[in-house]
Amino acid sequence: MEIAEIYERADIRSLPIDPLSAARSLGIKAVSYKIISECYQITFEELYRKSLWGFSFLEGEFPVIALNESACCERRRRFTAAHELGHCVLGHLHGGNLESAEREANRFAADFLAPLCVLERCGVSSAAEIGRLCGISESAAEIRLRELRSGIFRRDERISEQFARFIARYF
């Protein structure tokens, strides 16, 4: 599933993007480590060994995102939620190359939370502005700024149209 389709299905029209709301609109359940621990009788230590931040899995045939609600800061939790959403929509929960899946999920999260075609049309000029606008970490914002300045990215008209009112108000 393409990011533009997720934005459309979740009616996402502005930044910052709420990845958990998008997941819910796609029928993907998001639960805390506390709930996972209680439902599956798994200790927090076992969950932390799996991942300090979060992970995704299939419950039957339904994708679930498990998030450590006490991990780090809000921006890191948002990126983790978007990363796990990526695993769900990119089909990674059915197996495959783990290293490749992690790279793809990281790329998905960056593209999903900070769409370059929207940032370009908003005329952003600094990593700090991207971080504030998209609710991402300073390091993630710096990477997005470098990618934006390179000019080598897909300018998706569907996404630009979806965010048109937001872009117009941003100026």
Question: Predicted regions span which residues?
Answer:
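Active-site hotspot residues in diverse enzymes, especially metal/ion-binding acidic/histidine motifs
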Residues: 1-171
